[in-house]
Amino acid sequence: MNKKILFLGVGGIGVSALAIAAKRLGAHVAGYDSVANKLTAKLEALGIVIFISPNGVDVANFDIVVYSSAILSSHPLLSQARSLGIQCLQRAMFLAVLMKDFSYSLAITGTHGKTTTSSVLATLLCQLDKYSSFIVGGVVKYADSNIQVNGTDKLVIEADESDASFLFLSPQVVIITNIDLDHMATYNNSYQTLLENFTDFVSKESVKSIYLCVDDQGCRDLLAKYNQSDKNVTSYGFSINADVQIYDYHIIDEITHFKIRYKGDDLSFKLQLPGRYNVQNATACIITCLDLGFKYEDIRNALIKVTGVARRFDLYTKVISGHQVTVIDDYGHHPVEVANSISAVRDRYPNKKIIHVFQPHRYTRNRDLIKDWPKALSLADQLILLPTYSADEQIIKGAESQDIVKGLSGYLLADGFDHAIYFLEKLANENTVILIQGAGDVTNLVEILSE
């Protein structure tokens, strides 16, 4: 890739990964972001020039400009590049270009779990095939990075359905974890339009194998809608109707055990990640690797080394009011993700009381899922609800934090982190486990606990 490429919004997790991948594939790379952070520091350490002010950037020196969704079309650097006739590519469009440098690409998509599933498959393939690479939307703990380029054989990518940008991609393998109602403004608030976009994605000529979780209603709807016979379509899940059925799920000493029935064989596995949903995610990756020709024993040995992705059920021990307390930091921000996480906490800590500290993310999500929130937020033993993280949205009347728990009782409304800590200091002890959850800045609460 002998090109000069400028990445706008390079301080984000997705664009930073593309910048590193492009550099390792031979491109001359520079980046711009309005704020320096850990990711821009990492890029500078790799020899990538980072601009914090647009004033020092000579756009005319570049062949391609890649931009994140956070960069407005009116941004001066993007406007200048377009006026000069320089090729300008949205993040997913450039990922599609990068994919052409690899022999075989595997894309993971779905409303929930795609980052975790991508990290599982990336961890497996990097152990099973030293020439495998990955570009995902989170820090894979096994590699302590969101990107690794080990060659140009296999590439694992996360395909984003939230803005329909997965339609730019042309992989050979597609894993769909689930199809649910989120980011519905992208699909004109139409479930049928959402399904049609997923159908268009898996119908691409490049796609040869499709793996879907049949436990999910959205995936079942897609299977009913999809009728092409020229592709290898495999369903997986706990359902007896799955082509590859999961069974005998149980926890021993905080290790998840399960079996799958694959082409007549009963195969057993162990996994460090918690919950039925992560067993579903892992199964998709296992059968993908089996179909690629890797041996069961090698996959089994690699799977137990999978530690997932940052901010997905991260475990900490904190001292709170003199008590050692297990604290879990999790990115979940949708009712389905909340319910799955609380179920996983119950499975792993059956004798402990769950205190759920939740920070809603986006007023539009509160509004669109207003009927689903009360059930999900009632599942813990104690809910502490924080103000909604706006993500730059304007407040929507009737869609604030207190509105998503209408009909519930016993919850505690915290006006900020200090208030939440006050509640935790009153409630937490050795017999409790604290789940701190949300896609905003609530992870900072984990850091300041017991300081």
From Swiss-Prot:
It is found in: Cytoplasm. Cell wall formation. Pfam families: Mur_ligase (PF01225), Mur_ligase_C (PF02875), Mur_ligase_M (PF08245). Pathway: Cell wall biogenesis; peptidoglycan biosynthesis. GO terms for biological process: cell division; cell wall organization; peptidoglycan biosynthetic process; regulation of cell shape. Disulfide bonds: none annotated. InterPro entries: Mur-like_cat_sf, Mur_ligase_C, Mur_ligase_C_dom_sf, Mur_ligase_cen, Mur_ligase_N, MurCDEF_pg_biosynth, UDP-N-AcMur_Ala_ligase_MurC. Its EC number is 6.3.2.8. Coiled coil: none annotated. Keywords: ATP-binding, Cell cycle, Cell division, Cell shape, Cell wall biogenesis/degradation, Cytoplasm, Ligase, Nucleotide-binding, Peptidoglycan synthesis. The keyword Phosphoprotein does not apply. It catalyses: UDP-N-acetyl-alpha-D-muramate + L-alanine + ATP = UDP-N-acetyl-alpha-D-muramoyl-L-alanine + ADP + phosphate + H(+). GO terms for cellular component: cytoplasm. This is UDP-N-acetylmuramate--L-alanine ligase. It comes from Francisella tularensis subsp. holarctica (strain LVS). HAMAP family: MurC (MF_00046). PANTHER family: UDP-N-ACETYLMURAMATE--L-ALANINE LIGASE, UDP-N-ACETYLMURAMATE--L-ALANINE LIGASE-RELATED. Its main location: cytoplasm. ATP binds at G110, T111, H112, G113, K114, T115, T116. Belongs to the MurCDEF family. One of its GO terms (molecular function) is UDP-N-acetylmuramate-L-alanine ligase activity.
